[in-house]
Amino acid sequence: MDSVMIARRLGAGGLIAVAAVHVNWARGSAWPASDMQTLAQAVIGRNRMPGAVPCLSVSALLMLGALFVSGFPQHPPKLQRAGALGVVVTLALRGMIGASGRMPHDRASRTFAYWNRRLYSPLCIALAALCAAGLVLPGDETEFS
């Protein structure tokens, strides 16, 4: 397996894992927190979690992103590349803005700020890098040519 395929699979796998967590939250789970209020403070900086529809919407977008990044199923090459590039740009911007401490959450909890700096932003940057590597590393270019 070449480096391009490894990067694509790792990036897509990360997106799928995050999508699964959002589905879990849509079903009412407070994992990994002890209760919903603690979870909400940690993941969005508020006292209440969004409902199932917003959580499932985020999950669906993450899954779509994983399809673009993985190269499966085969989309028209320009659509595939544009979709994967959109994933990279979105994740990179989210990661950089979060890491800079300039997230537009003026009322966000300290718990969110803590986890945003230590987990969410670095995770977004790492996923962006993996997804970008799948676009730019030399390898089998047949999927995106």
Predicted regions and their residues:
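Short amphipathic, positively biased membrane-proximal segments
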Residues: M1-S145
